[in-house]
Amino acid sequence: EKALRELDILKRKGLLDQGDAHQHFFELSEIFRRYLGWRYRFPAPDWTTEEITVKFSSLPGLETQAREEAVRILIKSDLIKFARVEAAPGHDEIESVRKLIESTREHKVISLYAE
């Protein structure tokens, strides 16, 4: 999965450890939004967090807990990116995004027998 590889790259950059929370959460948000757009087929990178939140309410395959966690991460990213809220050390949200991606990605069913 491309998004998971991008999260690994972001982690290795160590932006949060270098004190660049703004850039870290900007990149994290972009990775997550691209994934959401690809997975649920809407232009998430171009939408506001509020628009994405409204869209989530109409997605039948997205569990409430995953929806709430996704919105929490997007809001936190917005606060750090735009309001310059300080990020807590050690709370990079990469693992939270990784878990959401892993729990919401489509699983392909492979048949062992030709039909």
Give residue ranges: language-model regions.
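Membrane-proximal, non-transmembrane interaction modules
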Residues: D8-E115
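Membrane-cytosol interface motif
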Residues: E1-D8
